[in-house]
Amino acid sequence: MNTIKTLLLSSLSIFTIVTANAQSFKEPVAFKLKNGMNIIVSENDRSPKAYASFTLDAKDFEGKKDGIVELLNAVLNENVAKNSNLSFKDNSGKLAVATASLDEELSGMAALIQHASINQQNFNTAKAKLLTSLKAKDYDYDQSVNEESISALSLSDVKAFYAQVSPEKTYLTIAGDVELNNAKASAKKAFGNWSTYSHQESSILTK
């Protein structure tokens, strides 16, 4: 449970919804979907919105190339429509929406993660933007994310890493103005049909 709380609080700090009144948070509830995906739900009826964070389980990706997660996030961002409530940064996908829209928006997030378009154009654009940001030093990236590590990564590296991402290696945190049963249903609807096979097939199709 300590690991769950750490992950939850880390996610909440990204969304800047932690208030002075910590008592508004209920004890987080953790469970797994049938495909092995880890889900954490924390209700906070004082929050103005519903939030979701999609993260990778770091221990399942030991030995990965430096900067690969941040570059994959940058490529995924090229798949996100303008003015979207979804963004990929800080090694995670983040969603902030009105509670009534959570079900629909979470399904959209899942579809993008499972069937991202990873091609040369998106890769080149994402890599250029990330390198520009690193040169400008306009964001506090992890020390492994630097001009040298990003420059060394290829489209093949990103595709290979993306193909390794599967449900049992990921966490979905849902928090804020949500009701537990509704959050469970939304998570199952959005990610319940995700399988390693379908994800790898999608990666092959983007070649």
Label the predicted regions.
Residues M1-S11:
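Bacterial N-terminal signal peptides that target proteins for export
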Residues N2, A81-Q200:
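Charge-rich, well-structured scaffold segments of protease-associated domains
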Residues I4-K5, A20-N83, A163, P167-K207:
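His/Glu-rich zincin catalytic helix
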Residues L12-A20:
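Hydrophobic h-region of N-terminal signal peptides that target proteins for export
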